[in-house]
Amino acid sequence: MKIDILDKGFVELVDVMGNDLSAVRAARVSFDMGLKDEERDRHLIEYLMKHGHETPFEHIVFTFHVKAPIFVARQWFRHRIASYNELSGRYSKLSYEFYIPSPERLEGYKTTIPPERVTEKISEIVDKAYRTYLELIESGVPREVARIVLPLNLYTRFFWTVNARSLMNFLNLRADSHAQWEIQQYALAIARIFKEKCPWTFEAFLKYAYKGDILKEVQV
């Protein structure tokens, strides 16, 4: 499952271990019990979420492949209970792939420059920076040094492996109007995948544990 985001980004589900019933089994092992009927299993998930018993959800694990601007990735990496591997600008020549916000992104802001001109200025700086990057590489400067001229809207790619408990924490903080708009779009994509793979857990999360706002305002 792959969801395109922004102008060139995406979130792709690479792997998932477990589902709603994984949390049920993990919770019931405390009492040496297994699965019951669907109604009672679903009720248990709601009970766990409502009362803050979150460790059973750590037994559901997702791996995502993410392509995002560097400034989004740096916010993402603040979520530390997870595993990350990122594209290396030291070992790889970086492609000309930059996030250019549309003029509509600036609607509602009192800028002294027209939004269309802001987009143009960002594109001009990006072009100049990337040309400089290529010139440095062609002149023998190592990639690890040449890359420092590139701006934060350069796209990077990384793998993110995270359990459902930490994923829900990510959604609490990033699927929220206080987060930057760009990372909100990625959080919505993560929520959509989470809902598809763990519908009972997602529903209970929204009902009892979600602290943000935008997931309740949009259809994921």
From Swiss-Prot:
Cofactor annotation remark: Binds 4 FAD per tetramer. Each FAD binding site is formed by three monomers.
GO biological process, one term: dTMP biosynthetic process
Alphabetized UniProt keyword annotations: FAD, Flavoprotein, Methyltransferase, NAD, NADP, Nucleotide biosynthesis, Transferase
Motif (ThyX motif): 78-88
Residues that, per the record, bind dUMP: 75-78, 86-90, 147, 174
ThyX domain span: 1-208
EC number from the UniProt entry: 2.1.1.148
Enzyme class, first EC level, given as a word: transferase
Binding site for FAD: 55, 78-81, 86, 163-165, 169
Catalytic activity field: dUMP + (6R)-5,10-methylene-5,6,7,8-tetrahydrofolate + NADPH + H(+) = dTMP + (6S)-5,6,7,8-tetrahydrofolate + NADP(+); dUMP + formaldehyde + NADPH + H(+) = dTMP + NADP(+) + H2O
Stored Gene3D superfamilies: 3.30.1360.170
One Pfam family here: Thy1
UniProt xrefs under InterPro entries: Thymidylate_synthase_ThyX, Thymidylate_synthase_ThyX_sf
The protein's annotated pathway: Pyrimidine metabolism; dTTP biosynthesis
Domain of life: Bacteria
Gene Ontology molecular function terms on file: flavin adenine dinucleotide binding; NADPH binding; thymidylate synthase (FAD) activity; thymidylate synthase activity
NCBIfam families assigned to the protein according to its UniProt record, in alphabetical order: thyX
Other remarks in the entry: Reaction mechanism involved a direct methylene transfer from mTHF to dUMP. FDTS ionizes N3 of dUMP using the active-site Arg-174, providing a new mechanism for dUMP activation. The phosphate of dUMP is crucial for flavin oxidation, suggesting that it acts as the base that deprotonates C5 of the dUMP-methylene adduct. A later study showed that FAD is first reduced by NADPH. Then, the reduced flavin, FADH(-), reacts with mTHF to form a carbinolamine flavin, which acts as the genuine methylene donor.
Subunit-structure text: Homotetramer.
Annotated family: Belongs to the thymidylate synthase ThyX family.
Protein name listed in UniProt: Flavin-dependent thymidylate synthase
Lineage of the organism: Bacteria, Thermotogati, Thermotogota, Thermotogae, Thermotogales
Primary gene name: thyX
